[in-house]
Amino acid sequence: MITSVQILSLLDQGLVDYSQVDALQRSLHEEVLAGGEDTLIVSQFTPTWTAGRHTKPQDIPSTTIPVIRTDRAGSATWHGPGQLVVYPVVRLKEPVDLVQWIRAVEASVIDTVREAWGLPVHR
């Protein structure tokens, strides 16, 4: 169970570069593994496609938007203006159903945005 978490909001920087946030996430991951504080990164990206390990060429439309290959599972994902992205960089202290945990975090973020700002957010 996570008891406290640092929130690192990049929203005041406007749209940020995916690669920079990816590097930050990896650095924070190393810190957390070494006993550092759990962190939520909150950001919004410049238009970018990320291509997971299962991405096929036809998964990404022909476009001038940059495509960044990632080591994550899955296929293509678009990131861009109007999309709030939250990355939890945490040490899970006990075995958990990871998909269920991610869905719970996602639901909490959606509920918080809806309640705090009254925005019509959805998954």
What are these regions (language model features)?
Residues 1-123:
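N-terminal lobe of the biotin/lipoate ligase/transferase fold
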